[in-house]
Amino acid sequence: MISVNDRLVSEAISHAVDLDQYGTGVVRRMLALLNRVDADLFAQLTAALVNLDAESFTVERLEALLMSVRTMHAQAYLQLDRALTNELREFVAAEWGYQQQLLPSVGVPLSFGTGVATAEQVYAAAMSRPFQGRLLSEWASGIEAQRMTRIRDAVRIGYVENESVQQIVRRVRGTRAAGYSDGLIEIDRRHAEAVVRTAVQHVAAVAQDRMIE
């Protein structure tokens, strides 16, 4: 006869696989959203740079021309943050339901008061706990700011080196042939991917912690 501990270990392994697959799906959806807004973002960046020739280039003029790009960029990451928030709210409801039925499903009765928190309370607890030293909201704003700085600095360097607008945009965004993975901002995409995966694991861990408190 399989012991309770063995069943719990089996459940933990199976659930870890499920969490990894779910996290991969969330990453794909978030990056697909980012890809859609990037198309508009870089079209606007190209249009802005066309109006800035090398002879009239100044940091002040560049900042003025990038204002609309910066606004669109911030809105893009706001969309990303909202989409991830919605994903995590739906996920925490399912994860909390799983945690509540886990012990009874392997023959361990719940004591009075165990698991009485609501999914919304678990979500609030997860959002109030930092992971890797920051809250989720701070991660989103941090990535957005770093990415915009990277774009601005790359444009400055491009003008100093007399690159064309197309060369500058291609160097920053990457090439379609490589799936845009060869651009300077690829590091920010990988950073966003890591944050999304960690956020899913973080929420799952908080749900488990609340269950055994």
Which residue stretches match the model-derived regions?
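Acidic, glycine-rich two-metal-ion catalytic cores of nucleic acid-processing enzymes
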Residues: 183-213
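N-terminal leader/targeting and assembly helices and adjacent pre-domain segments
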Residues: 1-182
